[in-house]
């Protein structure tokens, strides 16, 4: 199996393995699915952390309004009254004004937070360092864990406009957000290796050869963005160590320049004629007038 270290720009994303005979049409779609799936997990984790702290989403027409404005406009959060957390709620005001402030109790909050940490670990970039291959099954498992935790804490479900529910139903609206710029559609995805685009009409082995033990770094890119930057000759960690070495060397040379004491030149070992006198047997001869 060929090992693919998938990157986006200079950032490591995940490891994937595929036979050399894999069609690049299929492989590109697979990489894009895992890449987008990981983004989805991270978006859900971010929103679920807010859910644990401040409760469900307010209706769009109530978001950002003060309590006085809501009373004046006679607006009512009907879904907020239905979607009550299991075990009761604790009021924690959302300063941003996106959520209703009816947070779950401490026990239910920990259920959400623990599940979020576990899901993050499954799709973490640290899996690259650990040598763990991330598959679509692992991404789905992380999503199922998150869905299960929400069902435990909110047995009555979430409002239809809550971004967590919309993510689970694949109805999320990312337009105008930074998250929208990160997503790469399967049909628009490109894989690059060694400054060459891996054409969808070919097989992986057409580029990397027949050796199934090959490991390559591929970069996923949106069509039309051009070739990604080449990999640096040395990694950022190696560059850091190199700079540290030269800094230490400079400090040592600076100290040597400051230490201009030449008294050591009077030492026996500094006498360049000592060896000659030793062989002539004239070592330690003292001359004095009679």
Swiss-Prot record:
Pfam families to which the protein is assigned, alphabetical:
CFAP298
Task: Please provide the Gene Ontology terms (biological process) for this protein.
Answer: cilium assembly; regulation of cilium movement
InterPro entries, from UniProt? CFAP298
Q: Name one GO cellular component term.
A: ciliary basal body
Give the main localization category. Answer: cytoplasm
Statement: the UniProt record of this protein carries the keyword Ribosomal protein: no
- Keyword annotations for this protein? Cell projection, Cilium, Cytoplasm, Cytoskeleton
Q: Where in the cell is it found?
A: Cytoplasm; Cytoplasm, Cytoskeleton, Cilium basal body
| Quaternary context | Interacts with ZMYND10.
Purpose of the protein: Plays a role in motile cilium function, possibly by acting on outer dynein arm assembly. Seems to be important for initiation rather than maintenance of cilium motility. Required for correct positioning of cilia at the apical cell surface, suggesting an additional role in the planar cell polarity (PCP) pathway. May suppress canonical Wnt signaling activity.
UniProt similarity note: Belongs to the CFAP298 family.
Write the protein's name: Cilia- and flagella-associated protein 298
Organism whose genome encodes this protein = Mus musculus
**Which gene carries the instructions for this protein?**
Cfap298
